Amino acid sequence: MKTTNKWVIKPDISEEVYTDREHHLNYFYQAALRAATRRTTSTVLFGQRRMGKTEIFKRVVNRLFFEQDPKDPKAVVPVYYSFPDGPLDTNTFAKQYLENFIRYYIGFYTSQPNLIADKIEGDELLEVMESSRSLFPFTRMFDRIIRWHDAIVRRKEPLCHALALEIPRKVSDVDDTTIAMFIDEFQNTRLPQYNFEIVGFMQNAVESPTCPHFVTGSAMSILSKELIGRGSLYGRFMAETIKPMTHFWGACLARKSADFYNATISEEMAAVLSHKCGGNPFYINAVIKQSQLLQKPLLDEATINDVLAVDLSSGFIWGELNDQVNRWITRINDQNITKWVLYLSALDENTNQERRGELKLENIQKTIEHHEGKVVSIKEIFDVLVKLSRGDLVEYLEMGRWFRRVDDPILLEFLKVWGQFDVKGKSIDTIQYDLRKKYQTLSRQIHNYKGYLAEIHMSQILWNGQRKKLPKEWFHHEEDILLPDFIFIYNRRRLSSGKGKEIDVLAASGGEVWVCQSKWVVGSKIGIDVFKQLQDQADAVNTEMEPIKLRMWLFAHDGLTQSAETYAREHQILWSTRSEMDQLLDHLGLRQLPDI
């Protein structure tokens, strides 16, 4: 479609900063295009909050809108809709849903993106439709859409929301066209403000081969357990999962963000920041922006800790998570008890190996009694935790009927700060002082920054090289190396048995395991002792994981001593120098190791 516009729904993240979501962008773009051949199934995108799910949907919709010819019989009409958080009645919802669909459908076929961008509605939308009648290819459907609008808006047809939900499929079926519905904030359909059924009326719509529905939202527990995982929509969706960024891409984002916001971060600290933020792009950007506001270059770990402490207690992270937590708590009746339970859940440091992070409800009960002077029953605490789990603030393992803390270190740190302020009533100044003092005394999480940089590059080579043959010369091996399809690739991993030292990179496919070590040593070659350490780690992995095949790979910046080369050859250990690592990275389209 020829236009100077680049979007019909504005992305939230600038191109200069947007990083590493190509897999998901291509996945949904191609899935939408395949719908024209009737080979696409409705799909749900799972992932923690602030991972970029909404941004992916917006960018795919924009791309579909502008990169297709609407005159092509196989063109796919993209439609984006986000379920609002506020209260709606059935007629208001039905009108919003239908008019949103009309804007995209008519706008696409008549090459009028302004219909969507300007959010034209009501009588004005109908007037624009009539004036565009000659541009629209399906005259019969054009009139039918107007009649449906009249039924919903003027005649207030009973169950008008059910009609609105079915219309996209009806249109695609009658015209034999293809429509791709991108539905955001789907969990809102389960909230109290929607006092009418949504999900039950979507069953027929999402089964359509002509109109697949791609859905996501910000409360994964509701999506997976209540909407997609049971009831009328069970079994009707495929699943795609978005995970935190690898630290290779997290470091890349940190550098891009620093350039964009005129902040400063070193190569080594970009990787450290990603590590501390758990690869969450929102947290990474927040710390970068806060460092610019404070005029503090991120050149060492202590400064990152200090800036993170500021942002957790009064900055971008505080603002986002405080809004998220308080909005969810307002939906629960006894807010005072709920706040106590949530705060205490973040403090529980249970390190039991079998059920790590399990919350002890008895401890929560005793602490509330101590501070509030009343006994809250275990059942009431249990019920509150179930409600909190629906907002992804704790994790509920439903089959075992137990709870554990969420796997989000930054959110847990925030809850500790939030609880001091909102539950215990401490002044924000005191909280900020205590937190910054605590963070300034934290020990270094990473002691060899250069070695860690090499580790995250090794990990990314494994990710990007999956199912590919890599030249043997770069591994000093007799045959080319075919990388498997990995299930996981971990950095800095200890075996549960506790045997052996921390493994720099541990990766596993179905039956193949890789044990990797990084030695960024400049000016001298690596000797046999390092290989013996690597062999000890591999032996421990063999004992615990019992792989069918085990590979060892060492990064040695300046190479090996002659005796170490012999040892590596005899024990079939792969190894790569700085030059060979750079060639691997370049071969896979990745940024080479930085010059430090």
Q: Model regions: which residues?
A:
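Winged-helix-like regulatory helical subdomains adjacent to P-loop NTPase cores
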Residues: 285-376
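Sensor-1/coupling segment of RecA-like P-loop NTPase cores
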Residues: 173-182, 188-194, 201-230, 242
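Short, amphipathic alpha-helical interaction segments positioned at domain boundaries
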Residues: 319-321, 409-442
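Short amphipathic alpha-helical interaction segments
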Residues: 371-392
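P-loop NTPase nucleotide-binding core
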Residues: 41-42, 47-183, 189, 195, ...
